């Protein structure tokens, strides 16, 4: 709810038309960056594809150079559809071994630098993916990494692992339980 209120306040301060243009540009840039990163991870592209001067390619290169090179040891999958039986589903950007740990890896673009206290929704999302992967594939994912690049080419890395990851998994499961309770309540009222 706080995220929705903050977004509504931003839209009001910025103006609907300008906010829509910023949102559309960020979404397009993020999709293009994700596509390049996926192609790179699948071996479909080499670094020469960065010779072009487009911003999303520069951002992808920052993530590759500072977040993936010599750190991502195994790729188990890209754009992995994951599900927790009868509960939820989603798509993880990358799953593999990162710095020696079974890891969910998520790529994000941002218009400005992030602080960890502002990315709870991202952390909850990756925690949910780790739960789903562990249940369905009997894996032991014990880390989630979010690799971010801003439009100014500032690279950021956010990690949760061990007890902190378990905390986010439990927070996600709590939200999921509330969602299902509200859904059941709404069904009863209909």
PLM feature spans:
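Mg2+/Mn2+-dependent nuclease catalytic core
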Residues: 76-185
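Metal-dependent nuclease catalytic cores that hydrolyze phosphodiester bonds in DNA/RNA
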Residues: 1-89
């Amino acid at each position: 709810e706080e995220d929705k209120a903050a977004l509504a306040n931003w839209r009001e301060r910025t103006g609907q038309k300008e906010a829509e243009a910023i949102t559309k540009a960020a979404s397009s840039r993020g999709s293009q960056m994700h596509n390049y990163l996926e192609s790179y991870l699948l071996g479909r592209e080499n670094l020469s594809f960065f010779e072009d001067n487009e911003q999303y390619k520069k951002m992808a290169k920052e993530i590759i150079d500072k977040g993936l090179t010599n750190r991502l040891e195994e790729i188990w999958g890209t754009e992995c559809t994951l599900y927790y039986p009868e509960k939820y589903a989603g798509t993880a950007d990358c799953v593999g071994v990162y710095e020696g740990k079974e890891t969910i890896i998520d790529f994000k673009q941002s218009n400005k630098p992030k602080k960890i206290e502002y990315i709870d929704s991202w952390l909850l999302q990756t925690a949910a993916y780790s739960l789903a992967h562990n249940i369905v594939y009997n894996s032991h994912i014990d880390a989630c990494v979010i690799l971010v690049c801003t439009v100014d080419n500032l690279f950021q890395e956010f990690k949760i692992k061990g007890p902190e990851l378990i905390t986010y998994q439990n927070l996600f499961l709590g939200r999921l339980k509330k969602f299902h309770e509200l859904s059941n309540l709404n069904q009863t009222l209909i």
